[in-house]
């Protein structure tokens, strides 16, 4: 707990934050300054609950992922863009997959996301 208080680098909870209750406990203990939200780690409804608890507690937010393909990464990008308030974005794991049949409309080289052309839905199409 002392690390987060003494560090100028924001300490971010990753695997230790799987539920809204975890986020609340981490905030109450002042254990971290940020929470890494991952849809595949917690699921959509729990991720939304974690988001709201973290915002209410004044914690910074990060959107990330496990080793997921373009569908999951694109959905996470849309979630983060729609909710707002994210200080850190780590949605590049789709770039690590050498071959898949999908084209993510927002993911570009160098892990840059551009959702400006997005329409209804997640925007994934077959190549």
Regions flagged by a language model, labelled:
Residues 1-74, 98-107:
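Catalytic core of soluble alpha/beta enzymes
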Residues 66-127:
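Flexible C-terminal active-site loop/helix
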């Amino acid at each position: 707990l002392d690390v987060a208080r003494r560090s100028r680098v924001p300490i971010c909870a990753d695997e230790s934050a799987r539920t809204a209750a975890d986020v609340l406990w981490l905030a109450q203990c002042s254990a971290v300054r940020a929470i890494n939200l991952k849809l595949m780690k917690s699921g959509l409804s729990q991720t939304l609950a974690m988001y709201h608890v973290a915002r209410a507690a004044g914690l910074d937010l990060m959107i990330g992922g496990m080793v997921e393909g373009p569908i999951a990464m694109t959905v996470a990008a849309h979630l983060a863009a729609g909710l707002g308030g994210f200080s850190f974005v780590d949605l590049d794991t789709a770039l690590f997959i050498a071959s898949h049949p999908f084209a993510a409309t927002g993911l570009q080289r160098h892990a840059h996301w551009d959702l400006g052309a997005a329409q209804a839905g997640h925007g994934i199409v077959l190549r």
